From Swiss-Prot:
GO molecular function, one term: DNA binding
Cellular compartments annotated: Nucleus; Chromosome
SMART domains the record matches: H2A
Subunit structure: The nucleosome is a histone octamer containing two molecules each of H2A, H2B, H3 and H4 assembled in one H3-H4 heterotetramer and two H2A-H2B heterodimers. The octamer wraps approximately 147 bp of DNA.
Family from the record: Belongs to the histone H2A family.
Predominant localisation class: nucleus
Record protein name field: Probable histone H2A.1
Range of residues in the leader sequence: none
GO cellular component, one term: nucleosome
Keywords: Chromosome, DNA-binding, Nucleosome core, Nucleus
Length: 135
């Protein structure tokens, strides 16, 4: 009965590989799977669901951090603070739609001056006075 059972003198057991590294992700697939099971979102959780969810969360985090890093660089800062995350999210149309109801602590408000409060354009008033003089 060759090929059955453990071979004598077999090498050491294969080193365990995490599901995150198998999927090429940084986010923890095992932890997300545990949360999905403990949360009772469904009776059973498929094997691919936590991998997919981890990939989606990692993509969203990378997107927000990239935009926040750009906002920090625009403000000549080397550290991302909540204000930079707020500016990044609110200046992106899709992220604003996704996180519209979320409040970012210490994020501040978006700079906005109502059009009626802005000073009138000097060039447009000169053009109208020149036209009046010609008539």
């Amino acid at each position: 009965m060759a090929g059955r059972g453990k071979a004598i003198g077999a090498g050491a057991a294969k080193k365990a590989t995490s599901r995150s590294s198998k999927a090429g992700l940084q986010f923890p697939v095992g932890r997300i799977a545990r949360f999905l099971k403990a949360g009772k979102y469904a009776e059973r959780v498929g094997a691919g669901a936590p991998v997919y969810l981890a990939a989606v969360l990692e993509y969203l985090a990378a997107e927000v951090l990239e935009l926040a890093g750009n906002a920090a660089r625009d403000n000549k800062k080397t550290r991302i603070v909540p204000r930079h995350i707020q500016l990044a999210v609110r200046n992106d149309e899709e992220l604003t739609k996704l996180l519209g109801g979320a409040t970012i602590a210490s994020g501040g408000v978006m700079p906005n001056i109502h059009q009626h409060l802005l000073p009138k354009k000097a060039g447009s008033s000169k053009a109208s006075t020149v036209d009046d003089d010609d008539n």
